[in-house]
Amino acid sequence: MTKIGINGFGRIGRNVFRAALNNSEVEVVAINDLTDAKTLAHLLKYDTVHGTLNAEVSANENSIVVNGKEIKVIAERDPAQLPWSDYGVEVVVESTGRFTKKSDAEKHLGGSVKKVIISAPASDEDITVVMGVNHEQYDAANHNVVSNASCTTNCLAPFAKVLNEKFGVKRGMMTTIHSYTNDQQILDLPHKDLRRARAAAENMIPTSTGAAKAVALVLPELKGKLNGGAVRVPTANVSLVDLVVELDKEVTVEEVNAAFKAAAEGELKGILGYSEEPLVSIDYNGCTASSTIDALSTMVMEGNMVKVLSWYDNETGYSNRVVDLAAYMTSKGL
């Protein structure tokens, strides 16, 4: 069982913890966050979006206790000073959002810590991995600081892979209709992005995303072929990728959906979902898949222009992939 330390117990950190509770291959043994243990325990137990955690949760002065198991809580600003080895931590999940450069994230390495997973797009990382897409490229000997990409790249890449392998992708444009996140203001307040400065729960907010271009990190054959943007919307969770692509081959809606369904039931099972139900965003709250095709929305125009919608719980799905990645890396050797 892999021992995990979580650096940053925010939305993703806590959802990684929840996901780890349901995975017998990993266990969280230590958490680093500047917030006190009592507050962290309360926020773990009670969640507006995901509901009350089905576990006994309490707090001591420097630890939280979940189902009788004590997890140490540290409050250290400098990653290089963290005593991960005192608790046997082997993999650190870096989820503060602050240490996304390799030069910062690698400060966790040393002692018992063999690998770092950055729960965000990174810079200078050893490899970016999207489970189900390029995880087999992970090389334990050379990859120590690993990015799990973004939630949106984790949604887009699996079905872009299917489209490209089955029909060939010439080019495409993506929009993610994305729930608001902590990188927006709840009321109109200063922000470096003047649109994200506006009240998140009251506005649809056009903004940027690097998710489409980042697909090339895990699918090099699509480099330069995809681009896109985001619209942040007034929902607290669950997002939707809208992809329009021009394919090499002429296809029908039925052929495209059949390819998605086959992948969802086969090589991408658990990663890519497929639905023919007339569902809405709240129905995907808590969905552990990275991406779920909304088959009723698939459209084809003039044979080779295809529009695809795919849902994702941008917290739960992504956090489950972080845990899956940690388990996979361990299976290949730390």
Curated annotation (Swiss-Prot):
The record marks H178 as: Activates thiol group during catalysis. GO terms for biological process: glucose metabolic process; glycolytic process. Coiled coil: none annotated. It catalyses: D-glyceraldehyde 3-phosphate + phosphate + NAD(+) = (2R)-3-phospho-glyceroyl phosphate + NADH + H(+). The keyword Nucleotide-binding applies. Its main location: cytoplasm. The active site is at C151 (nucleophile). D-glyceraldehyde 3-phosphate binds at S150, C151, T152, T181, R196, T209, G210, R232. It is found in: Cytoplasm. GO terms for cellular component: cytoplasm. Keywords: Cytoplasm, Glycolysis, NAD, Nucleotide-binding, Oxidoreductase. Pfam families: Gp_dh_C, Gp_dh_N. GO terms for molecular function: glyceraldehyde-3-phosphate dehydrogenase (NAD+) (phosphorylating) activity; NAD binding; NADP binding. Pathway: Carbohydrate degradation; glycolysis; pyruvate from D-glyceraldehyde 3-phosphate: step 1/5. InterPro entries: GlycerAld/Erythrose_P_DH, GlycerAld_3-P_DH_AS, GlycerAld_3-P_DH_cat, GlycerAld_3-P_DH_NAD(P)-bd, Glyceraldehyde-3-P_DH_1, NAD(P)-bd_dom_sf. Induction: Repressed by salt stress. Gene3D superfamilies: Dihydrodipicolinate Reductase, domain 2 (3.30.360.10), NAD(P)-binding Rossmann-like Domain (3.40.50.720). Its EC number is 1.2.1.12. The keyword Aminoacyl-tRNA synthetase does not apply. NAD(+) binds at R11, I12, D33, R77, S119, N182, N314. Catalyzes the oxidative phosphorylation of glyceraldehyde 3-phosphate (G3P) to 1,3-bisphosphoglycerate (BPG) using the cofactor NAD. The first reaction step involves the formation of a hemiacetal intermediate between G3P and a cysteine residue, and this hemiacetal intermediate is then oxidized to a thioester, with concomitant reduction of NAD to NADH. The reduced NADH is then exchanged with the second NAD, and the thioester is attacked by a nucleophilic inorganic phosphate to produce BPG. Homotetramer. Belongs to the glyceraldehyde-3-phosphate dehydrogenase family. This is Glyceraldehyde-3-phosphate dehydrogenase 1. It comes from Bacillus cereus.
